[in-house]
């Protein structure tokens, strides 16, 4: 657990299990992308983004049909770049047509709006592609809230369990490690962020069945986070 007492002025947030229920990701987003994948590969084969992802798949799994490899990765919930890119394209179509709309935890948008109004800087770091992150926050049941964030970071900056990834985000944003709070439900990610000097807090959402660790502060809502770290709270 970090010992810094500097005031927090920047917050880096995970998505799944932190701002959005795990059930939405696994019961809505993932099945939608799996069902859409055959058509996406067939109908958009000439799309540069699809071609690039297919080339990456061939490099990672030579001789394996792209759809077979994608299904294998999805079965294992792998965080692989070309899979995330193609899932993002599938979700883009779903959000565009209105078939998808993200449901955030009810405490999220009010808390983030309070923090932004108070001058805090907010950014997202998720294994989902930057495009997918923007789609989620741009199409929520609370409306388009993507503008609350100044940055969206994905696996291109590095894996979420590597301290170097958090150092890279700090270098790109210019944020001070001791004044930056990272929120996630995954202990290994929090460990990496802490190694990079960030403050940390584990979100343990009761509806997700997250198991609390013993190395980081724990909160069940963003309001709990605010109280623990002296951030703006509801009146």
UniProtKB/Swiss-Prot annotation:
Monomer. Bifunctional enzyme that catalyzes the enolization of 2,3-diketo-5-methylthiopentyl-1-phosphate (DK-MTP-1-P) into the intermediate 2-hydroxy-3-keto-5-methylthiopentenyl-1-phosphate (HK-MTPenyl-1-P), which is then dephosphorylated to form the acireductone 1,2-dihydroxy-3-keto-5-methylthiopentene (DHK-MTPene). Binds 1 Mg(2+) ion per subunit. GO terms for molecular function: 2,3-diketo-5-methylthiopentyl-1-phosphate enolase activity; 2-hydroxy-3-keto-5-methylthiopentenyl-1-phosphate phosphatase activity; acireductone synthase activity; magnesium ion binding. GO terms for biological process: L-methionine salvage from methylthioadenosine. Keywords: Amino-acid biosynthesis, Hydrolase, Magnesium, Metal-binding, Methionine biosynthesis. CDD domains: HAD_EP (cd01629). It comes from Gluconacetobacter diazotrophicus (strain ATCC 49037 / DSM 5601 / CCUG 37298 / CIP 103539 / LMG 7603 / PAl5). It comes from the Bacteria. InterPro entries: Enolase-ppase_E1, HAD-like_sf, HAD_sf. Pathway: Amino-acid biosynthesis; L-methionine biosynthesis via salvage pathway; L-methionine from S-methyl-5-thio-alpha-D-ribose 1-phosphate: step 3/6; Amino-acid biosynthesis; L-methionine biosynthesis via salvage pathway; L-methionine from S-methyl-5-thio-alpha-D-ribose 1-phosphate: step 4/6. It catalyses: 5-methylsulfanyl-2,3-dioxopentyl phosphate + H2O = 1,2-dihydroxy-5-(methylsulfanyl)pent-1-en-3-one + phosphate. It is an enzyme of class 3 (hydrolase). Its EC number is 3.1.3.77. Pfam families: Hydrolase. This is Enolase-phosphatase E1. Signal peptide: none annotated. Its cofactor is Mg(2+). The keyword Hydrolase applies. The keyword Hydrolase applies. Belongs to the HAD-like hydrolase superfamily. MasA/MtnC family.
């Amino acid at each position: 657990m970090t010992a810094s007492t500097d005031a927090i002025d920047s917050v880096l947030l995970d998505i799944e299990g932190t701002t959005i229920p795990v059930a939405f990701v696994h019961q809505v987003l993932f099945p939608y992308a799996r069902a859409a994948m055959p058509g996406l590969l067939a109908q958009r084969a000439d799309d540069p983004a699809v071609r690039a992802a297919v080339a990456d798949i061939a490099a990672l799994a030579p001789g394996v049909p792209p759809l077979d490899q994608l299904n294998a990765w999805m079965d294992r919930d792998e965080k692989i770049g070309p899979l995330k890119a193609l899932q993002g394209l599938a979700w883009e179509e779903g959000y565009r047509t209105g078939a998808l709309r993200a449901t955030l935890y009810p405490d999220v948008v009010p808390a983030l709006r309070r923090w932004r109004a108070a001058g805090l800087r907010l950014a997202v770091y998720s294994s989902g592609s930057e495009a997918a992150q923007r789609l989620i926050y741009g199409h929520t049941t609370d409306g388009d809230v993507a503008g609350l964030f100044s940055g969206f970071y994905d696996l291109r900056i590095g894996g979420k369990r590597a301290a170097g990834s958090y150092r890279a985000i700090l270098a790109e944003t210019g944020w001070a490690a001791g004044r930056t709070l990272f929120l996630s439900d995954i202990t290994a990610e929090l460990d990496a962020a802490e190694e990079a000097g960030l403050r940390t807090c584990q979100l343990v959402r009761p509806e997700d069945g997250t198991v609390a660790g013993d190395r980081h502060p724990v909160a069940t809502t963003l309001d709990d986070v605010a109280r623990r770290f002296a951030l703006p709270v509801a009146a």
